[in-house]
Amino acid sequence: MSNYAPFIKPYVEYNEHGWGPCEVPELDVPYQPFCKSDRLGKICDWTAMVPEKKFPSKYASTFGNNSQYAYFYEDDDSTFHLVDTTGSKATKPYQRGRYRPNMRNNVRSRGRTGRGTPNIASLGGSTAGGATASTTKYGKGRNTRNTQNMGRRFGRNAPTRIRESSVMVQSDWVSIEEIDFPRLLKLALPNIKDGKDIATCGWLEFYDKLYDRVNLRNEKPLQKMDRVVHTVTTTDDPVIRRLSRTMGNVFATDEILSTIMCCTRSNYSWDVVVEKLGTKVFLDKRYNDQFDLLTVNETSVEPPMDEEGSINSAHSLAMEATLINHNFSQQVLRIGDQEPRFMFEEPNPFEEPGVDLASIGYRYRQWDLGNDVVLIARCKHNGVIQGPNGDVQFLSIKALNEWDSKVTNSVEWRQKLDTQRGAVLASELRNNACKLARWTVEAVLAGSDQLKLGYVSRMNPRDHLRHVILGTQQFKPQEFATQINLNMDNAWGVLRCLIDLVMRQPDGKYLIMKDPNKPMIRLYDVPENAFDSDGDEEEESSDPLSNSNDN
């Protein structure tokens, strides 16, 4: 037993006042600063991983890189020295190239002529809008257009514009349905045949071919035509009242149909009154409504502001565009007692004694939309022209107007209209997509052979009363619809969807309204006397262009 070492019991401290050790250990433990953004690596790597060449400090700490923050345990003061306040440049932490564009495979920025210089010749030399790309120092290409919006990032800083509704929604109106534009864009009603004429009224004058020669060197001033255009609603049309007794169950005008069929391109608010009487539906408009005014730059990035008293406000520009369209459509015709006219079967239903009416021919046409839905609409032509084979071709004459190219940041017509007419039309398609689509739909519904577009500009950007004609252009409505990406099957589908929605409702009055601030269509059930207060001024609203010569 003596050969073994004796067993000595270890000393165990006993804490009478608590638990844990009785003596506090040494507190002078050095503190190592750290950074919370450091990437966590492995504690020990037995595989001897090869360090990265591109980012050698990938797993290194980014806190305390300067030597003055390093910890050295020394008891004496022999190593005491002053701290250099300048410090060295800290190593940037490792970050992935998340927001850095990869320029290695960017062909557009390098081109084929050099590593970093864009090839101007390969890009066409100029943009579609007419702005040429300028090359700055060190070969970096920069586009000088839209420089005032370069500070914005994807339009985040753009102010939100709150538009007003076309009609004030009352508390006693009942909301029936809300349909957003993405749902409407998926609709389609194919294989709709061309409309069949059931009545033709009025007369038309022939187009003056001298206006096809108008250009920037040979511009013509726009005259003020003292002619009256009646904008009669659907229910007040005597021909539609006569036809509704024997045929059809849906009645409307071409302006109302084009507004509904092109609703997915609209930004401004509008409304259409619907009256359901048994199996018949009448699509109508309110009295004293601004429904017949043409919008200006509705679909542009920066539409006109609503400034009272300004000639460039949204309402002033709409009035100006409407008068320009009326005057241009009558000026380009061969007017005179000795000039020939094309007469329809019936006289103008809105003719009044002693009133000089505008040259407009009305065609009441019928379409079969399926499921016992028969549409009858009043369409119109503005003129006729002698075809190459001696036949008569119907025209829809419209006018685009330029008010201030610097304010709208668009192509200046007086510089680009003769040489780059496609760029001018592309700019108008971008700024007035809804208006051009409506004109195209109206021409297709009426069966026009040609769509005449005139380019009218102000003589002075500050004068909204005097204008000049800078040129004209013609299209076939069906081909132009394809160019502007207008799908007629979708347009018929949108119309049929709203008609079916109203057909399922009981008899009464309804309102289809475009939401002023959302891409959405709303259907309301309104009282029978909702808009009767506007009917007292029916006569004034029926001819808003009768005094166009006073403006």
Swiss-Prot record:
Q: Name the residue ranges with Basic residues bias.
A: 95-113
What coarse category fits the chief subcellular location reported for this protein?
cytoplasm
Q: Where is the composition biased (Low complexity)?
A: 121-136
Please give the superkingdom of this protein's source: Eukaryota
Where can this protein be found?
Answer: Cytoplasm
Its Gene Ontology molecular function terms?
Answer: mRNA cap binding; translation initiation factor activity
Q: Does the keyword RNA-binding feature in the UniProt annotation?
A: yes
Gene Ontology CC terms: eukaryotic 43S preinitiation complex; eukaryotic 48S preinitiation complex; eukaryotic translation initiation factor 3 complex
Give the protein's biological function. Answer: mRNA cap-binding component of the eukaryotic translation initiation factor 3 (eIF-3) complex, which is involved in protein synthesis of a specialized repertoire of mRNAs and, together with other initiation factors, stimulates binding of mRNA and methionyl-tRNAi to the 40S ribosome. The eIF-3 complex specifically targets and initiates translation of a subset of mRNAs involved in cell proliferation. In the eIF-3 complex, eif3d specifically recognizes and binds the 7-methylguanosine cap of a subset of mRNAs.
Q: Which family does it belong to?
A: Belongs to the eIF-3 subunit D family.
Q: What is recorded about the domains?
A: The RNA gate region regulates mRNA cap recognition to prevent promiscuous mRNA-binding before assembly of eif3d into the full eukaryotic translation initiation factor 3 (eIF-3) complex.
Protein name (record): Eukaryotic translation initiation factor 3 subunit D-2
